[in-house]
């Protein structure tokens, strides 16, 4: 089990949190690229998947519920896992946060189920909340698409803005690629979108430029 440990001096007003596998991958990309004045966090039910990320703050969701083995592509497990860690999530967001970006790949268990829980806490705290999510490739099947649609409907209840990236559109742009390459493009686009918006906000709004 990974220990939740919030750095004492880390309290930027803009935070980016990656939820689940896709969201965590995107935030890892962003962290490696580097954005000043933004705090990065990843949270997942899959403890092993988080270990390889250089992002310094990692929150394992639902350790008691899942045993660190993931949500099994079941959104209700992702939701209940986030509810298990409500106080930890709140502790992250309460430290002077003015704007929150939530990145997630929808269609699986953790991103789909946990992202709306995090968004609801953010809304409750009066934080400007932006969701940036991907929806599955068609070849991933009808069930994942239905899960993604449910996740979008839940997120819309709590976020101030929601950017939806359709993975099938990426296939149209990049053509037929190996499966790993296709998912890599999805992570890259998710990362680029969040990074671009966060940088615009950081430079033009909060710096007073």
Where are these regions (language model features)?
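Tubulin/FtsZ superfamily GTPase core signature
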Residues: 1-209
